[in-house]
């Protein structure tokens, strides 16, 4: 692959400082690692991703711009306060959320959370007013909402996320395993960790998914949050596959090891650290970061921009896929319908990719077995692209 060259051009002197403009020269695109042109890249920006929502086929455009984040904690005034040690109005996060829901109204409600470990399941129901949930400690790791649950956990006697209702299934299931689930619109979070502490292999099953956070309502903003798990850590998607919801993650941290950012929603990861953990899989298997199930009528799935992709646990170089398409509810290639079945969409741009990323083929076959293909394909062409990335895993 042709190497990328960056050149810096001095454009002005301001206050004694030289201001540089960086221009990225085009990288040769390959069939297995397609790169956007500068012109095409203008179609895949934060503004484009987050401009529209609603029913696919008749999306509503409101040009939502969340890039300012949720605001400074110093400017918040808590309507409800939570402290695990009993020094505040509520001891659990869910109790404060329930109080905000029961109070009704449409005004934004602020819930402060004192540093501590909150071992509980959290549901922000669809009926909730706009809620800002924030940790008082600026270190997100000091305020953790954590629970141990997973897809194969026996359902009998197990608690499941209350946003999901009851089920007759023998096991908890993927989404019911979520430590926290947000179904309301206009949810904001800051200075918090959402974690699923399930230890994979506790229960035998090929699907060891254990969700830390599921975002199912529109216009969610999460700033300085950590979302930690292994398989299926973070889900973004509406309750209906025909509906587009949006989430914006700013200066946040997402960790996992298999398909750990997944779903049919539209999400932007801006200035985030996306970290693969080799603690469970080690060097024995290639894995995947993104697993989008974007509907074919939605041009925007996941965007990572100005972000860092790295690893912990010393996985081998050139081993990790950036992603694969999650062909949700499609059992195999014979059941895949071009233009109707899901066709995941991801763009990674202006980001730093660590050496663990596969160089020649960073995008894997879909979950239904569709071979990765970017053009002239038997099945729907994959919608995975890169632009202007750097680092040992960028292929540049």
Curated annotation (Swiss-Prot):
The keyword Cell wall biogenesis/degradation applies. It is found in: Secreted. The lineage of its organism: Bacteria, Pseudomonadati, Pseudomonadota, Betaproteobacteria, Burkholderiales. The gene is pme. Its main location: secreted. It comes from the Bacteria. Keywords: Aspartyl esterase, Cell wall biogenesis/degradation, Hydrolase, Plasmid, Secreted, Signal. It is an enzyme of class 3 (hydrolase). This is Pectinesterase. Involved in maceration and soft-rotting of plant tissue. InterPro entries: Pectin_lyas_fold, Pectin_lyase_fold/virulence, Pectinesterase_Asp_AS, Pectinesterase_cat. It comes from Ralstonia nicotianae (strain ATCC BAA-1114 / GMI1000). Residues 1-21 form the signal peptide.
């Amino acid at each position: 692959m042709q190497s990328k060259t960056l050149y810096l051009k001095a454009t002005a002197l301001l206050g004694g400082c030289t201001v540089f403009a960086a221009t990225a020269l085009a990288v040769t695109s390959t069939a297995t690692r397609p790169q956007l042109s500068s012109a095409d890249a203008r179609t895949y920006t934060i503004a484009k991703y987050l401009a529209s929502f609603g029913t696919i086929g008749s999306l509503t455009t409101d040009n939502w711009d969340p890039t300012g984040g949720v605001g400074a904690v110093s400017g918040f005034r808590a309507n409800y306060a939570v402290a695990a040690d009993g020094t505040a109005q509520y001891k659990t996060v869910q109790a404060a959320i329930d109080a905000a829901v029961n109070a009704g109204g449409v005004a934004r409600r602020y819930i402060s959370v004192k540093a501590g470990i909150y071992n509980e399941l959290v549901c922000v129901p669809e009926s909730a007013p706009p809620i800002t949930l924030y940790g008082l400690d600026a270190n997100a790791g000091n305020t953790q909402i954590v629970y141990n649950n997973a897809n194969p956990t026996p359902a009998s006697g197990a608690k499941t996320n209350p946003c999901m209702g009851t089920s007759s299934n023998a096991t908890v299931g993927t989404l019911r395993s979520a430590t926290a689930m947000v179904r309301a619109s206009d949810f904001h979070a800051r200075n918090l960790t959402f974690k699923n502490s399930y230890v994979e292999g506790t229960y035998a099953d090929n699907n060891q998914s254990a969700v830390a956070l599921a975002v199912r309502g529109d216009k969610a903003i999460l700033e300085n949050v950590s979302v930690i798990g292994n398989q299926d850590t973070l889900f973004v998607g509406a309750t209906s596959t025909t509906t587009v919801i949006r989430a914006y993650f700013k200066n946040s941290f997402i960790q996992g090891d298999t398909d750990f950012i997944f779903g049919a929603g539209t999400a932007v990861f801006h200035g985030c650290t996306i970290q693969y953990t080799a603690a469970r899989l080690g060097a024995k298997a290639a894995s995947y970061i993104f697993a989008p199930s974007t509907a074919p009528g939605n041009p925007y799935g996941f965007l990572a921009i100005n972000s860092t992709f790295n690893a912990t646990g010393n996985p081998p170089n050139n081993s990790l896929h950036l992603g694969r398409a999650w062909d949700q509810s499609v059992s195999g290639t014979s059941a895949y319908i071009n233009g109707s079945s899901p066709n995941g969409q991801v763009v990674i741009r202006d980001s730093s990719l660590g050496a663990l990323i596969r160089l020649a083929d960073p995008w894997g076959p879909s979950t239904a077995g569709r071979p990765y293909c970017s053009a002239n394909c038997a099945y729907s062409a994959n919608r995975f692209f890169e632009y202007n990335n750097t680092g040992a895993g960028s292929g540049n």
